[in-house]
Design a protein with these regions (language model features):
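Short, positionally conserved secondary-structure boundary motifs
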Residues: 1-63, 83, 94-95, 109, ...
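Charged, well-structured alpha/beta interaction segments
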Residues: 64-65, 73-74
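Structural motif
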Residues: 70-71, 85
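Hydrophobic beta-strand signal
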Residues: 74-75, 88
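Short, compositionally biased
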Residues: 83-106
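Soluble "head" domains of membrane/secretory-pathway proteins
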Residues: 100, 112-115, 136
């Protein structure tokens, strides 16, 4: 079940880049001048920098959600989880990344659902040690 390793988020998030205002996915645009700017992940992508952490995904339990072995999950601990959120949960002393399913809450349990039919949901009952540690807001993935 241990399919995410938390990474220290204390690093410089500013990258000096030459970027264009838009990247067209259809026909190429005429040559445009490059803008000299910087991309700061905390400023441009993260709403709660002080509550955001990164985790390296290991395993294949979330492949049908597009989350693969080696991806880096960006986790916001300040975001409120809801039914269907992809969360990082701490279950019985281990971290895992799964869909949160609260539809059985009135029956005394919730489930953490994988996105791969090879795996079964994890049923969380009142006797389990459980905490939603944060909500996955996006992933960073290698393409090569």
């Amino acid at each position: 079940m241990n399919d995410i390793d938390i990474i220290n988020s204390q690093f410089n998030t500013t990258l000096p880049l030459e970027i264009t205002p838009e990247l067209r996915a259809g026909f190429p645009s005429p040559a445009e001048e490059y803008l000299h700017d910087s991309l700061d992940f905390n400023r441009d992508l993260i709403n709660h920098p002080e509550a955001t952490f990164y985790g390296r995904v290991t395993g294949d339990s979330m492949t049908d959600a597009g989350i693969n072995d080696g991806d880096i999950a960006v986790i916001d601990k300040a975001r409120e989880p809801h039914n269907g959120s992809i969360v990082v949960a701490f279950v019985n002393k281990e971290f895992t990344i799964k869909y949160l399913d609260t539809t059985h809450k009135d029956q005394g349990y919730i489930e953490l659902r994988p996105a791969n039919p090879k795996y079964k949901p994890i049923r969380i009952g009142p006797d389990d040690e459980f905490e939603v540690w944060g909500v996955v807001i996006f992933t960073i993935k290698p393409w090569n």
